[in-house]
């Protein structure tokens, strides 16, 4: 499991045209619909964070929680990600910060700065599934 705190330069981000923001993220802003694969920039956030091996996507369960302290003018997100292997998370971070290929980094990092974080071992569940009664839940065997 990885946890990271990112601070965002919202003034600089909001100064960008919407089309540029969409190119950086790889999604349409008003609808949040993912752009078609051939329309995405190679440095789009959702391209570089998609990890594949042998043509198969390697799953990472991800979530972001926005936060803000108006008095400090500090705004950002806490990111948390779970994966079967830390190799998946390391590959995602390498793609984002170094680039794939090197130099083709995630342009969202021009506006977001990781200020803290950690990588933790979390033991698996016995059944391989986690969820409430009556619902399938998340299949952690894929992660």
Whereabouts are the PLM-identified features?
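Long, histidine/aromatic-enriched segments associated with O2/redox biology
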Residues: 1-143
């Amino acid at each position: 499991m990885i946890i990271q705190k990112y601070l965002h330069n919202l003034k600089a981000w909001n100064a960008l045209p919407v089309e540029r923001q969409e190119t950086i993220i790889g999604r349409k802003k008003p609808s949040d619909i993912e752009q078609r694969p051939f329309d995405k920039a190679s440095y789009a956030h959702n391209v570089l964070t998609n990890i594949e091996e042998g043509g198969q996507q390697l799953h990472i369960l991800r979530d972001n929680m926005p936060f803000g302290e108006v008095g400090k003018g500090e705004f950002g997100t806490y990111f948390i990600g779970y994966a079967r292997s830390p190799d998946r998370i390391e590959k995602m971070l390498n793609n984002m910060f170094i680039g794939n290929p090197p130099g083709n980094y995630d342009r969202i990092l021009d506006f977001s700065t990781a200020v803290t974080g950690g990588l933790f071992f979390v033991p698996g569940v016995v059944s391989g599934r986690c969820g409430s009664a009556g619902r399938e839940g998340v299949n952690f065997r894929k992660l």
